[in-house]
Amino acid sequence: MSENSLTITEILSSIRTLLVKHNKAKVTQIEKELLQAVAELEKKFKQQVQNFNELQQKIPNLQKVNEEFRLKVEKIQEEAQKKIQEKVAELTIKSKEELENAKKYVIEKSIDQPLIIIDQFEIALSYAQKDPQVKNYTTGFNMVLDAFSRWLEGFGVTKIAIEPGAQFDEKVMAALEVVPSDQPANTVVKVSKSGYKLHDKVIRFASVVVSQGNKTE
């Protein structure tokens, strides 16, 4: 029995001596309740001691868990930082590529008018072959057309080379008309308007007349 229990027992003995003459049953009840309270306190105290001992045993394990957790957190931080750096590098490269493409194709929106001028010179040259009065101007027309074409080439604009007899290619051609012809089906009979590329991008499809083949076949 602990010191606290002995002290309470002595108190109970004194109380019993003082009150035994007045109410023996009441004293017995009080004594019983106090003894129960003491027993409960002792039980709780022993439980707390046991809990404390168990906690002391767990401390090394807790330290190990904390160290493992710290290492995991550091690993996650390193991986996150690596992914962020990769994403930044990717966005930087993408931004540079987009900027280069923007520079590369900036002329696209304003190229229509120069191409119309070239079309007019090409039409004039085609008529010049038939009209002797205009034929005298072909040399000058060709010089201007060549100079203008070279100027456009400086911006990356080039004519798509298509000749009659070529196979129709929907990637660079648009069929204005399909006509009977001695040439094989799906063959270019005539180039009505030249097509152009800006670097590797088709900015205007060539307008062509396409053969449907010989009707007698």
From Swiss-Prot:
Subcellular location field: Cytoplasm
Keyword Chaperone: yes
Keywords: Chaperone, Cytoplasm, Stress response
A GO molecular-function descriptor: protein homodimerization activity
Domain of life of the native organism: Bacteria
GO cellular component terms attached to this protein's record: cytoplasm
SUPFAM superfamilies found in the cross-reference section: Coiled-coil domain of nucleotide exchange factor GrpE (SSF58014), Head domain of nucleotide exchange factor GrpE (SSF51064)
The keyword Chaperone is assigned to this record: yes
Described function: Participates actively in the response to hyperosmotic and heat shock by preventing the aggregation of stress-denatured proteins, in association with DnaK and GrpE. It is the nucleotide exchange factor for DnaK and may function as a thermosensor. Unfolded proteins bind initially to DnaJ; upon interaction with the DnaJ-bound protein, DnaK hydrolyzes its bound ATP, resulting in the formation of a stable complex. GrpE releases ADP from DnaK; ATP binding to DnaK triggers the release of the substrate protein, thus completing the reaction cycle.
Subunit record text: Homodimer.
Protein family membership: Belongs to the GrpE family.
Protein's name according to its UniProt entry: Protein GrpE
